[in-house]
């Protein structure tokens, strides 16, 4: 233990986890692996942005989008619009983030990463839809718009007064609507 804190080796069992945490097998992410002679370096993965709600059960929302991106070997970024308390039996709570928080997340990703495509999901209210539309309108990348309205268990995930904003502001930006 260094400085009274346990190290990974102190805490790891003498199993495959312990050997996986061996300092000799952990590669410094700042060090690029050596390319075999004559082999081209692998292209970096495409980057996609998902904008939507968080599902605490992990079965929908941005969690599902990020799992899909990973399966497709796409680097996934996210911007949260809402946080839900839900599981396989239903949704017990939905909290919308302020539109300014959504805008800040989208701008943070777009200012640093070359996003090649994006997907929207749950945008609970008119303010979130307007914020997303303002951020997405100038982007010349494919946009998949998924107007999430109701959960699988029947909970409303789009306020009725926001439906027209979806039609007017987001759907015209879409290359694909689900």
Stretches with model-predicted labels:
Residues 120, 124-178:
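Conserved beta-alpha-beta core of the PfkB/ribokinase-like small-molecule kinase fold
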Residues 1-117:
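Small-residue (G/A/S/T)-rich helix-start motifs and N-terminal tracts that mark the onset
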